[in-house]
């Protein structure tokens, strides 16, 4: 059966924030093939290390599928931290083991599910950083990958004086328009997916205030 989700009283919660790849990339207790991976984070030795620290909850920096910004790609660099989301319903494949990557998306997803299950069995709550304030499509000079091609005017906020001008409250080139119910539904559906299908216990919203900012005010 599925392990029960730990429920730590807020007064006793100790959150440890980590990057799946960065935290395990040089872990001496892991075999090389597990370093930098979801499976490496789920390894008993990794979980034992975290237990020894006395933390109760693990906050994962973004693990939703990402794509680096164009200006980074042009310099042969990547957005290491993952705050450039491409797939809100998909885990980032580059953090999976080589075996899972070669097996395909289903195997990558299963590796994430197994990681969360192992954390629960070890007594940890699992929190995930999520980025709904902007997408990887960046500003006007950015690529058309998904939302811009589907319905540019509906998904992204615009300035009042010029509908063609993106209203950038994030400093990342665009801002998703949460005054549009379709955008809100999309975000909630993806959160529900991660909670119900993957097993995530909670979420930390990047630049949360921008999600409800309207005409310069938080509503």
Label the model's feature ranges.
Residues 21-44, 48-199, 207-218:
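Substrate-binding/active-site clefts of carbohydrate-active enzymes
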Residues 1-17, 24-37:
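The feature marks proteins involved in alpha-glucan
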């Amino acid at each position: 059966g599925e392990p029960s989700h730990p429920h730590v009283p807020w007064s006793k919660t100790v959150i440890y924030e980590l990057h799946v790849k960065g935290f395990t990339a040089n872990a001496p207790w892991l075999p090389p093939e597990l370093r930098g991976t979801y499976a490496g984070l789920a390894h008993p030795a990794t979980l034992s290390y975290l237990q020894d620290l006395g933390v109760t909850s693990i906050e994962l920096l973004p693990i939703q599928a990402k794509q680096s910004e164009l200006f980074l790609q042009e310099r042969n660099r990547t957005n290491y931290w993952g705050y450039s989301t491409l797939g809100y319903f998909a885990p980032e494949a580059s953090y999976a083991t080589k075996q899972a990557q070669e097996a395909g998306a289903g195997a990558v997803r299963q590796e994430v599910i197994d990681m969360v299950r192992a954390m629960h069995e070890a007594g940890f709550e699992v929190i995930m950083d999520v980025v709904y304030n902007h997408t990887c499509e960046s500003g006007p000079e950015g690529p058309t990958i998904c939302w811009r091609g589907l319905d540019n005017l509906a998904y992204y906020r615009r300035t009042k004086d010029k509908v063609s001008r993106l209203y950038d409250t994030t400093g990342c080139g665009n801002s998703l328009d949460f005054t549009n119910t379709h955008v809100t539904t999309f975000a909630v559906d993806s959160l529900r997916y991660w909670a119900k299908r993957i097993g995530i216990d909670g979420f930390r919203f990047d630049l949360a205030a921008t999600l409800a900012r309207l005409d310069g005010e938080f509503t």
